[in-house]
């Protein structure tokens, strides 16, 4: 009985380690054979090291990882940009309305970012 319990727990531990290993490989940007992401592959020693990060990840590798792991992120980013431009237009309308009504707290000079 104890032998079967030990065997089952060791198999379970092996499966968990294998699952974590596969998940780690997927998160580090290794492309699987069925990946359809359109990203250029450049060696990791590209020389584009971001000095602001503690773990010295390459900026190009991070963007490639994002494209590989989230191929729908480009469409999502485009939708976010469209929504942001709509919000910006609404804020300009609101600012114009407030200035035309004589609200003194609104600044006529907006800083663009």
Swiss-Prot record:
The chain crosses the membrane at residues 4-21. Specifically expressed in testis. Expressed by cancer cell lines. Its main location: membrane. The keyword Chloroplast does not apply. Residues 1-3 are cytoplasmic. Disulfide bonds: none annotated. Keywords: Cell membrane, Glycoprotein, Membrane, Signal-anchor, Transmembrane, Transmembrane helix. It is a single-pass type II membrane protein. Residues 22-113 are extracellular. It is found in: Cell membrane. GO terms for cellular component: nucleus; plasma membrane. This is Kita-kyushu lung cancer antigen 1. It comes from Homo sapiens (Human). The gene is CT83.
């Amino acid at each position: 009985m104890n032998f079967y319990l030990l065997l089952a727990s060791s198999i379970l531990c092996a499966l968990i380690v294998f699952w974590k290993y596969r998940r780690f490989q997927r998160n580090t940007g290794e492309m699987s054979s069925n990946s359809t992401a359109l990203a250029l592959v450049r060696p990791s020693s590209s020389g584009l090291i971001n000095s602001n990060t503690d773990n010295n990840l390459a900026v190009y590798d991070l963007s490639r990882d994002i494209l590989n792991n989230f191929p729908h992120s480009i469409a999502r980013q485009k939708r976010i940009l469209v929504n942001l431009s709509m919000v910006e237009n609404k804020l300009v309308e609101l600012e114009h309305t407030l200035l035309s009504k004589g609200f003194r707290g609104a600044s006529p000079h907006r800083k663009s970012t």
